[in-house]
Curated annotation (Swiss-Prot):
Keywords: Centromere, Chromosome, Coiled coil, Nucleus
GO biological process terms, semicolon-separated: centromere complex assembly
Compartment list: Nucleus; Chromosome, Centromere
Keyword Coiled coil appears in the UniProt entry: yes
Cited function: Probable component of a centromeric complex involved in assembly of kinetochore proteins, mitotic progression and chromosome segregation.
Gene: cenpo
Source organism: Xenopus tropicalis
Protein name stated in the entry: Centromere protein O
């Protein structure tokens, strides 16, 4: 009898320790999420401020463009001759440089910065995702005798040559914007895959990237449905190389019962609407909450 009571007490204490551990882990995650939301709100305010500055710089660039067009118009009309024509060309070149400087300053607010060199400009494209600064890429763009890329650190699977062919000669601003979209989306997908690999092996396993662009990701993860453990397999497809979130999430499970399929459907939407690691954190928290509730009910029955 005494042995039974001792075992019972040990079971109760063990159960209480489990509840305490679950509560602590849940509190830590909630605090982490609160801090992340606070940082996100701060970043959103910063974005609004930077957009305002960007719009001011856009207006400044447009004024420079108008002045350049005015100089070109006077040249075509033959208003300037001899040394006056040389002065006009010099002034127009200076305005072009001012336009380029203003453009680079504007892009710096959105991840692109640059500095003048003897032959042109050196551009740095800095990528970020969810407030985390990621990789930076560099390009040396020559402006003389013609516009072209002399050196760069862009990965070979980014279609730099195609983007340059379409935009570099005619619209430098468009060229930088399109290239930034490609690089920033790639860095965001790569970052999410790295975050995926940081999850415990008991929750996420067999994480793999389908290609260098990280446009296909596969992994398995464990969940509980109706208090039973199941292993789900996920395949995330990014339909465009400028996307940071998947266009399709294919999730499979060997068990076809309705409750499992319902869980799969909700997870598919979650993966397509949120960064990968955020979606998995939500799934993990949901699973721990269910386990916590089940343990609490078990404790009630024990007493």
């Amino acid at each position: 009898m005494e042995q039974a009571q001792s075992l019972f007490r040990e079971g109760v204490l063990s159960h209480l320790e489990q509840l305490e551990a679950l509560s602590y882990n849940l509190a830590v995650k909630q605090e982490k999420q609160r801090q992340e939301w606070a940082a996100l709100r701060k970043n959103q305010e910063l974005v609004l401020e930077l957009r305002k500055k960007r719009d001011e710089l856009k207006a400044k660039i447009e004024r420079h463009k108008a002045e350049i067009q005015a100089f070109r118009g006077r040249e075509e009309a033959g208003e300037d001759h001899g040394s006056a024509a040389g002065t006009s060309q010099q002034a127009m070149l200076e305005l072009c440089v001012e336009e380029l400087k203003g453009m680079l300053e504007m892009h710096w607010l959105t991840g692109i910065s640059g500095k003048r060199t003897k032959k042109g400009v050196c551009v740095c494209i800095s990528t970020a995702f969810e407030g985390a600064y990621l990789d930076s890429f560099h390009l040396d763009i020559a402006l003389k005798p013609s516009v072209g890329i002399s050196r760069h650190s862009v990965p070979p699977f980014i279609p730099l040559e195609q983007i340059a062919k379409e935009h570099l000669q005619t619209d430098l601003k468009k060229f930088l914007s399109v290239l930034f979209e490609h690089l920033n989306a790639y860095a965001g997908r790569k970052y999410q895959f790295q975050q995926l690999q940081s999850f415990p092996g008991g929750f996420v396993r067999d994480a793999q990237q389908g290609n260098s662009l990280h446009t296909v990701l596969t992994f398995g993860y464990n969940v509980r449905v109706e208090k039973q453990p199941f292993c789900l397999r996920a395949k995330l497809l990014y339909g465009g190389v400028t996307r940071s979130l998947p266009t399709e999430a294919v999730i499979t499970c060997e068990d076809n019962r309705p409750s499992v399929q319902e869980k799969i459907s909700s997870h598919s939407s979650l993966f397509c609407q949120n960064p990968l690691h955020r979606a998995l954190e939500c799934i993990s928290s949901e699973d721990e909450t269910l386990n916590h509730s089940s343990a609490s009910l078990l404790g009630t029955h024990m007493f």
